[in-house]
Amino acid sequence: MAATPVPCDLADFARNRITFQSSWSHPMPITDGHELISPHAYAEHGPPHDLWTRLRVESPVHYCEPEGFEPFWAITKHADICEISTQPERFISEPGITVLTDSQRQALDTSAFAAMRVIIQMDPPEHRAVRKVASPVFTPLAIRALDEEMERSARELVDGLAGSSGEGECDFATDVATAHPLRVLSHMLGVPREQEPDILRLTNQLFALDDPELQRKGDDRQQAIMELGLELYEMFDKIIQDRRAHPREDLASILANGTVDGEPLGMMETVGYYLIVFSAGHDTTKNALAGGMQAFLEHPDELHRLQAHPELVDRAVEEVVRWTSPVNYMKRTAVEDAVIGGQRISDGDCLVMFYGSANRDADEFEEPFRFRIDREKNRHLGFGIGEHFCLGANMARRSQRALWLELSRRLEWAESAGDPEQIHSSFVVGLKHLPMRYRIRPATL
């Protein structure tokens, strides 16, 4: 007898995390949610695809109470995530988009981050008004104007891999995947090349609060997070003041001098805009590129397919984003009672939408666990959907496109040179190290 999803009128059983198996007298717990949200679980095991698969079948809207974290409903089906995401008036972002430990929440609430107002934590109508400040810069036409810069970055990085002999070893995650989007974003925001290491360090610290290698150092974690927030604020404040006094033709100036309803964008909103554009824009693309290369190493026939058919590059980009799902989840808070996936959700409940699970949903994707760059129907949620669809999606796509094309033309062969290492993070997921060996062809004019 197959497991039966918990219906509406048995929601109290769902809150006790029970699902019924072959015997009604032996309820078996699926999960308390720890494997879904613990940064260290992701570092050790990677994304929990086996557990997500089970949840999608047995308990697609699953109540979780992981020790040390706030309780939440785990949403694992593609259709349910779309339903929630397209009702921003019922499921809001303002209370927060991540699941935090009590200590993390206390540290963030007492740091400079508490004052920053980031666009992904705004709700309509404010969100739409603030989004319009930068949206003209991220249209497909505007981003295509950056193709030359993206192609230059890709060419220079692959040239660096080639060296004098064309053969070598590298850590693709740090040497290429990290560097490429950083250069593109620095160009857009007018950040000097010499300041890029500081941006990278702070971005790593922001998205890897629990990673022993990347996190801000210090025994007092609350103090470390406070210092991180202050340093980010001071760095962006300098850029904002400069662009207000000396505006240029760049995104930094547009944000620094942005207006909403005829009024200047507030300082905290402006700093928050910088924070999300630079940190999220860099980290997500970096993780897609690193995870994409890992996928190509594990599925060399797909790399050969791209090399033989470069016209598939746009589909390849979409498949890499589906496969890697760099933004693993987003949290929403219900502001009224609702029913999702047959479960009663109460006003005030937290819902965590796991995009990594939705992107392997067999009800949406044919052969979801197969990496294939010629996938035609690919309605993945790697960039989200609805009100908060990724503002920088066009940039992320074109940036990845440039690098995959350059590599497909010049990479003769590549293989793993060691074990990849996962970032200690459950929110933005990916590889911090990907050792590989390779042979690169010389560039052609």
Regions found by a protein language model. Name each.
Residues 3, 7-445:
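Cytochrome P450
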